Amino acid sequence: QDKPFWSPPIYPV
């Protein structure tokens, strides 16, 4: 069972 891993792309401003 795959775990829903969602990482939003955060860029240093």
UniProtKB/Swiss-Prot annotation:
TM stretches of this protein: none
Record's keyword terms, sorted: Amphibian defense peptide, Pyrrolidone carboxylic acid, Secreted
Subcellular location: Secreted
GO biological-process terms attached to the record: defense response
Sequence positions bearing Pyrrolidone carboxylic acid: Q1
GO CC annotation, single: extracellular region
UniProt-listed Pfam families: Tryp_FSAP
Tissue: Expressed by the skin glands.
Domain of life of the native organism: Eukaryota
Family per record: Belongs to the frog skin active peptide (FSAP) family. Tryptophillin subfamily.
Name of this protein: Tryptophyllin-T3-1
Species for this entry: Phasmahyla jandaia (Jandaia leaf frog)
